[in-house]
Amino acid sequence: GINSESAAKCVEAGASIVIVGGAITKAENAEEATRIIKEAMLTRKPIVTKLYKKYHEEELYEVFMKVSTPNISDALQRKGEMVGILPVVSGVKAVGKAITVRTYPGDWAKPVEAVDIAKPGNIIVIDAAGGDKAVWGELATWSCVQKRVNGVVIDGTIRDVDEIRALKFPAFAKKINPTAGDPKGFGEINIEITCGGAKVRPDDWII
């Protein structure tokens, strides 16, 4: 975003109009923030300011929990959404760093393995190629609850949805089917995957 450190560079590059957002609206003193930005533009010299808060990594969880996904989509220029992935449990929100899983349709071995290595706060993101056989259910969900995993997102199928809803566990999937596949063990963990058309890498923020 544009602030007092970058506005001068915009003017130097030839901009006659500079649109500033959060550097003013999120500043503790909006009037002072505006004055500093105008000064930077007039002098064409960047001015370091502490009026605009930059969040540290450890603070991002709380920030993302307060911001809606539509607002995040707007900030990302309408990119990054997972198309066709729907909430299994309504009224819950999930935020966390991704553990990624690529598996074959119906093969739930790697998703279960991902639960074993997940840390509190993680979200497990599974690329099951949109398959019709379930790769996730109640038992994996219970394990996540016990390990304080924040949620699961599946480009594929989930089952045991009544039990998962009773647990209020944040689960998102493309399809629901009571029939599970077989644990053949194919696939990989913590690689770049595609989920709902979006590229997801290990440790990406999932909201």
Identify what each model region corresponds to:
Residues 12-17, 168-170:
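Glycine-enriched alpha-helix->loop->beta-strand junction motifs that scaffold or abut catalytic
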Residues 10, 21, 76, 144, ...:
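Buried hydrophobic positions in well-ordered alpha/beta secondary-structure cores of metabolic enzymes
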Residues 54-202:
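Feature captures the catalytic cores and cofactor-binding loops of soluble hydro-lyases/lyases
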Residues 16, 22-25, 202-207:
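A hydrophobic, small-residue-rich beta->alpha segment in the mid-to-C-terminal subdomain
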Residues 1-5:
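Glycine-rich beta-to-alpha transition loops that act as phosphate-gripper elements at the mouths
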Residues 11-14, 22-50:
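C-terminal helical cap(s) of enzyme catalytic domains, especially alpha/beta-barrels
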Residues 18-19, 153:
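Conserved beta-strand positions in the central sheet of alpha/beta enzyme cores
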Residues 7-8, 34, 140-141, 203:
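Generic hydrophobic/aromatic pocket-lining and core-packing "Φ" positions
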